Amino acid sequence: MSYASARTAGAGLDRIWADLDRQGYALTDEAAIGLPEKFRENFGQTYFNDQTLYRYEGDWPVDRKRARDVIRYQWHDDGLHVEEHDTITITDRAGIAGKRDHVRVMFLRDSQAKELIHTFLNLVPPGRRQADGTFGVNLFRTFTNVVTTPHNDQEQFCIFYIVNRIGGGAETYLYRPEDVPDQGEPTADPVLRHQLDPGEIIIFEDRLFKHGATPLEAPNDGIAMRDAVVCTVDYPGTYLAAAN
């Protein structure tokens, strides 16, 4: 990273940390956190393709394609250390009971993906960082519905990065949990409703909100599509507590 990029990233991190402390979420973009100019184009070409992403029977939305990795990270005095976690299995998530495995992408073998992971983990304010944790990295390509209903991921932080979008809709929303009953419609306006454009990023503290996105809207001359990197800064109970 150049000196100018590092300086920009430092200023961007200060604002992100302040926004997270003040309101529980922060909107930013790839330039503000110091990602290289061609990063999104190169990352999208490498990973958002039919050789990497797969559709799974029983998944929801039914036309979603996906892949996944889980990173084990540790913060030491000399900085951030990362390695591949030994499993990527998810259990009882997104309203689907049981254990599920998806295609694994070994991100740490790729320098650009490793840079993204380091950059995203640095978005977490220093005082909120776990010394030893796991970081879920999901690639989602969606064509109609992005999600089904407002929900929690039951993790510490969520990070969404939009790599590409064709068409409209897909407006990300955050509701206060008390404003979304388990059954029925929200009883108040969302705290945030924002259409994330390619290159934009949101990070939020998961316990403070129920989140989701509106359906994609196809352009007049084609098919809608959104490519997104969806990451979770996991609680220990997701992987590490069970392993210990």
Task: Tell me what each language-model feature is.
Residues 72-134:
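Signature of the catalytic double-stranded beta-helix
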Residues 2-11, 67, 74, 78-79, ...:
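Generic detector of solvent-exposed, compositionally biased contiguous segments
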Residues 173-244:
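Catalytic core of Fe(II)/2-oxoglutarate
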Residues 129-196:
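Catalytic core of non-heme Fe(II) oxygenases with the double-stranded beta-helix
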Residues 1-94:
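N-terminal auxiliary "cap/dimerization" subdomain that precedes the catalytic jelly-roll/cupin core
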Residues 27, 156-158, 228:
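Intrinsic-disorder/low-complexity, polar/charged segments enriched in Ser/Thr/Lys/Arg/Asp/Glu/Gln
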